[in-house]
Swiss-Prot record:
It catalyses: 1-(2-carboxyphenylamino)-1-deoxy-D-ribulose 5-phosphate + H(+) = (1S,2R)-1-C-(indol-3-yl)glycerol 3-phosphate + CO2 + H2O. Pathway: Amino-acid biosynthesis; L-tryptophan biosynthesis; L-tryptophan from chorismate: step 4/5. This is Indole-3-glycerol phosphate synthase. Disulfide bonds: none annotated. It comes from Parafrankia sp. (strain EAN1pec).
Amino acid sequence: MNALEEILDGVRADLAVRERETSLAALKQRVERVPDPRDALAVLRAPRVSVIAEIKRRSPSRGALATIADPAALASLYEQAGAAAVSVLTEQRRFGGSLADLDAVRVAVDIPVLRKDFVISPYQVLEARAHGADMVLLIVAALDQPRLIGLLERVESLGMTALVEVHDETEMLRALDAGARLVGVNARNLRTLEVDRETFARLAPMVPQGVLKVAESGVRGPRDLLQYAGAGADAVLVGEAAVTGGDPRQFVADLVTAGTHPATRIAH
C-alpha cells in the first residue's frame, strides 16, 4: 500500500463518522446560512504570480512542522503579507487539520479560502461550502474519471472553484478532459512522497490558454517562485516553508514581492 492509499483509508473512516454525526440535510441548511463564495479565479487572474499560503501543522513526509494554536491569527498574517488566498488543511490523521480550522480562518480573512483535503465524496464538497470554503482541492490520483467529473461539477454548482491537482502527464490530460479551470501541479508524488521541481515545467505546456496553473510543493523562497513563474505559473501554493521559517508574515511578503517582479509578467 502506497502513501496515498494509506491516507485515503483514514479519510474514508473519518468521513463515515462525520456522515453519521451530521446529515446531508443539516449540511444543506448550513450552506444556506453562509455567505456566498468568493471568486477565486478572478483573484488568481491578476497580472502577477499570486501566493496561496497554507495552514499546515504536519505532513506525511516530515511529520510535525509547526504548533499552530491559532490558525485564524496565522491566516490574518498571511493576508496582511499580501497572500491572494489561504489554504487550510482539514485532514486530521496525517496533517493535523480540522474543519474547525476552516471555520476559524473563514471568519478571520476576506480573501478566498481553499479546503485542502482528500475529497472523494459529494458530502465533503457540501461540507466545504457549509464551513465557508471558496475553493476545494480535487486530487486526480485519488479519483476515477467519472468521480472526478462529478465532484468538479458539484464544486462549481455550489459557486466554488475546484483546484484540480495533478502529478504527471496522464493526470493532466484527465484534469483538462474533466473541464478543470484551475490546475495545480504538485511537485510531490503522493504515492512516493518524493519532490521533483521539474514536474511543473514539464506539464505546464500542456495547459491551454485560459486555464490557470498553480505550482504546488517545493517553494522554499522567492527564487523558486521566479523559477515557476518562468515556466508559466499563475500562482504558487506554499505551506511547509511558510510555517517552519520562523516569520511566516515576512516569508509570504517576500514571495508576494517576487510575484510582482516585472520578470513574472514577461513570463506570462
